[in-house]
Amino acid sequence: MLLAIDVRNTHTVVGLISGSKEHAKVVQQWRIRTESEITADELALTIDGLIGDDSERLTGAAALSTVPSVLHEVRLMLDQYWPSVPHVLIEPGVRTGIPLLVDNPKEVGADRIVNCLAAFHRFQSPAIVIDFGSSICVDVVSAKGEFLGGAIAPGLQVSSDAAAARSAALRRVELARPRSVIGKNTVECMQAGAVFGFAGLVDGLVGRIREDVPGFGGDDVAIVATGHTAPLLLPELDTVSHYDQHLTLHGLRLVFERNRDAQRGRLKTAR
């Protein structure tokens, strides 16, 4: 059983994956709030409470974090509480199997890397990956499995909250599809702007990529969505052809398997 930990700026996904390679399956997944000052002990208490008896069946762990302080605590947690479980943390120097054809590879978020890796592994074709999180990342992977770059926009909730915080007449609203693109009250107007506006933003970015990037105009390009708010926008999107709730977790699994196999089964355990 592989423990997969995906730490983002606002929320953290913890998953359990059984099997490996083509037989791998996410059997459990939890989503909890990210606390930037959380300690290794608090993390261990939370995760052990989630996975229960499966804690004794762990054969590996893989983690990423877009919050550097939390990645450090994840490392300490794995070393202290699961010292015999081999683990991989997605950070510079770790073999991911995906070349980063960008100006500064160290700047590319680990979440973007594993998403593109998982998309290419699944479809074996050029792909555009859209991750709907606190930011919306639209990333591009070539037919050779190379990360070509992408675009980043503020996420739906972040944008909606910012609008409410900076205007006395607006308030924080639930992200939901309104009755119409023409809102009849302030809440519906904000929902329409968020849902239909961001659907247009994503379709526009995908369309521009397909027009401007050589090799991305054909039918062989996989356009994959993932992320917590993706289901809200999927009915409004014209460009997305696939949705994978577990894309990031499978990307973590792929990196773990690559490093395990490269080291003949010997990955880092606590000293």
Swiss-Prot record:
Catalysed reaction equations from the record: (R)-pantothenate + ATP = (R)-4'-phosphopantothenate + ADP + H(+)
Localization per Swiss-Prot or TrEMBL: Cytoplasm
Chief localization: cytoplasm
Enzyme Commission numbers on file: 2.7.1.33
CDD domains linked: ASKHA_NBD_PanK-III
Leader peptide range in chain numbering: none
InterPro entries for this protein: ATPase_NBD (IPR043129), Type_III_PanK (IPR004619)
Entry's Gene Ontology BP terms: coenzyme A biosynthetic process
One GO cellular component term: cytoplasm
The keyword Membrane belongs to this UniProt entry's keyword annotation: no
Cofactor note: A monovalent cation. Ammonium or potassium.
Active site, per annotation: D111
UniProt-annotated binding residues for substrate: G109, A110, D111, R112, T186
Residues the record lists as binding K(+): D131
Pathway in which this enzyme or protein is active: Cofactor biosynthesis; coenzyme A biosynthesis; CoA from (R)-pantothenate: step 1/5
Binding site for ATP: D6, V7, R8, N9, T10, H11, T12, V13, S134
Assembly mode: Homodimer.
NCBIfam families recorded: baf (TIGR00671), PRK13318.1-3 (NF009845)
Protein family (similarity comment): Belongs to the type III pantothenate kinase family.
Function description: Catalyzes the phosphorylation of pantothenate (Pan), the first step in CoA biosynthesis.
Name under which the protein is recorded: Type III pantothenate kinase
